[in-house]
Amino acid sequence: MDQDAAQDSAGLIAEAKGIAISPTMQRRVLVATSNPGKLRDFAGAAEVYGITMVAIPNFSSLPLVLEDGATFEANARKKAEAYSLAVEGELVLADDSGLEIDALGGAPGVHSARYANEEPHLLDSNIKDEANNARVLRELAGMPPEKRTGRFVCVLAAARDGHTLQTFRGVAEGIILDAPRGTDGFGYDPLFFVPQIGKTFAELNAVEKAQYSHRGAALRKFLDWLSPGQRM
């Protein structure tokens, strides 16, 4: 499908969902990530708004931003501001997200990506995910389901030319299983069970993921903020 046809298709989907697409709406957003799972989540949710989300060009060659903030908001803002300086005039969206488990006092929290290793960027993503999940399972071993509550949190920061324009927070509540289920997710998705739909995040298709996930919730807030044509 060519670009014009894709935009027409997205417009029809948006119309059917009652989403108004302004002719002056920002049509492209650069995402500060090289994580293919996150990019899929972003692109799938943005499609119905007629918005294209792609990774920042040559993102892997940019200096790594140290995620040393105490909150998801602090890390998201830091990344958005730093990476937006590399693409002058472009709207950049950065994400910081993680899993908070009540029985672990909110851990892994902002350390979710590096829970089993302080330098996760040096590891293959599958190895990193397996190690992080294994640590969570060890720490929750023997706990009954009612003690395994937690939530995924996502904070998005939109920035241009080094300045944060707005942040958006999304939360998804669930239960941490005692064994992984599903193959379509990434990170802690195979362990995160949503009783409302009877599935883990790794068992959801793209449409379901956009509807129920923390990232989908935050992204809808961002897209609603963007849709009147703001921040052109």
Residue ranges and their predicted role:
Residues 16-30, 36-232:
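Anionic-ligand binding patches
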Residues 2-4, 8:
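Intrinsic-disorder-associated, low-complexity terminal segments enriched in Asp/Asn/His/Tyr and depleted
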